[in-house]
Amino acid sequence: MPPVDKQAVAAAFGRAAPHYQQHNELQRRSADALMARLPARRFARVLDAGCGPGGISRYWRDNGCEVTALDLSAQMLAEARRQQAADHYVQADIEAIPLASAQFDLVWSNLAVQWCDSLQDAVQELYRMLRPGGVLAFTTLAADSLPELRQAWRAIDEKPHANRFLSREALDSALSGLRGEFALQTLSVPFADALSAMRSLKGIGATHLHEGRASRTLTRSRLQQLQLAWPKQQGACPLTYHIFTGVMTRD
């Protein structure tokens, strides 16, 4: 895959910051699934890497943790700060965190590392942040996510309209040498129509394409074509995601 344009990613999420919370059902469900895999213990210091507007940062802070919220997007961090979500705020790339090693009891990253150039580099950088005995918990999107979006667009053209994500084999390879508990699960989010489904992607900033944006405008007629071609489930237009979860403890 081509290198990730980090500035474009940050800009897409920045545009989504004011209304992100209205469209983040996937993020909430993914966070719930990751939370269920954490060991039952208290974490004094938490790094929320890819914090977005700070919903999970605020959860940890409300539970008595000292929280550092990190995001690539200045606008997302500004929203997190407005919500008083954390104790500290850092604008940075997950693959190059400007913090000293071994600071945190929990490093949390929910659906953020898929925007990195290298999963291996991102996870190693997050792992570097852990104190001995600390926990790294992360989720990312896996291959064959968003099949409905791809199928619907094929009725119109063959251009890429969704990012490609790593296969389970590639994910396992990137994490080889790291001990932890890894799992893959499927989450499906229903929408009333194709337009609502696509608005949800825009609403969370997940519209940046690593391979470049298709140039054609979404006209009313194309939207009607998408609606007709979208695979339906009980009358709804779903978006299906394959979520890879990793939980590791540093020796």
Swiss-Prot record:
Entry keywords, A to Z: Biotin biosynthesis, Methyltransferase, S-adenosyl-L-methionine, Transferase
**Molecular function terms in GO for this entry?**
carboxyl-O-methyltransferase activity; malonyl-CoA methyltransferase activity; S-adenosylmethionine-dependent methyltransferase activity
**EC number per UniProt:** 2.1.1.197
Q: Does the keyword Methyltransferase apply?
A: yes
Tell me any Pfam family this protein matches: Methyltransf_11
Give the catalysed reaction(s), semicolon-separated. Answer: malonyl-[ACP] + S-adenosyl-L-methionine = malonyl-[ACP] methyl ester + S-adenosyl-L-homocysteine
- Give the record's pathway: Cofactor biosynthesis; biotin biosynthesis
Which domain of life does the protein's organism represent? Bacteria
InterPro entries linked: BioC (IPR011814), Methyltransf_11 (IPR013216), SAM-dependent_MTases_sf (IPR029063)
* Gene Ontology BP annotations: biotin biosynthetic process; methylation
The UniProt similarity line reads: Belongs to the methyltransferase superfamily.
The UniProt function text for this chain reads: Converts the free carboxyl group of a malonyl-thioester to its methyl ester by transfer of a methyl group from S-adenosyl-L-methionine (SAM). It allows to synthesize pimeloyl-ACP via the fatty acid synthetic pathway.
List, alphabetically, the NCBIfam families matched: BioC, PRK10258.1
This protein is called Malonyl-[acyl-carrier protein] O-methyltransferase
Species this protein is from: Enterobacter lignolyticus (strain SCF1)
Task: Identify the taxonomic lineage of the organism of origin.
Answer: Bacteria, Pseudomonadati, Pseudomonadota, Gammaproteobacteria, Enterobacterales
Which gene is transcribed and translated to give this protein?
bioC
